[in-house]
Amino acid sequence: MTRLPDRAGGGTGAGSGAGTGSGTGPGGAVRGTVGASASASAASSEDGVPPDLLRRFTTAERWVHRASAALMGVAIVTAAFLYLPALAELVGRRRLLVIVHEWSGVLLPLPLLAGLASKAFRADLDRLNRFATYDWRWLSRAVRRVPGPRVSGKFNAGQKLYASFMAGAVLVMLGTGIVMWFPYLTPLVWRTGSTFVHDWLAIFIGVLVIGHIGMAVRDPDARRALRTGFADRRWARREHPLWEKENPPPGE
């Protein structure tokens, strides 16, 4: 089980102890400590998660994201040095850069395939592949920049579209990249078409990844959930209300 941040458990115990032990003297302090522990245990859910937190990602899911992000980052950076003249002049061993780029692209699907061994990861893939009525409403409000809350489940419509596009784009980039890697296995028209698709799709992916990072920079709670695996319940209620309702606090 993923360990909780120390501040979560400490906050619960401190608040309960202060309320229970005040004005009772030395004996009351002991009773307050015991009461704090009992209150913290009662307030926690069955898996040890405090009521003000929600388990958003397991350890396996977080490592899938980290490995995929690392490989994607290497592929994008090496591509930039290979295709932009200003950066290409800075590289002394271009052939080594080509090899790193090729293998980072080939290995990119592996974290996703390894993640399929995780039940939680498969459940999240199922959520990402479902586009409900409220997702269309979320998308409409986002496109028209309508202010106010937008209803979504664990993943909003934007995240679902991003995940679906990136999954398909990685496969296209892998296929076209292999054609470019082994040019003598295919006719000239295939190589020409693959180069065209690979180059333009790479630019589009780069723009999307930059936008994805920009969204994450503006949302510290989302970053914390990816880093620790736990999301603040207030953030979940505001950004993903349907998912928060599926996981009510203990006792409700």
Map each language-model feature to its residues:
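Membrane-embedded alpha-helical bundles that constitute the cytochrome b-like, heme-associated redox core
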Residues: 1-13, 17-20, 24-252
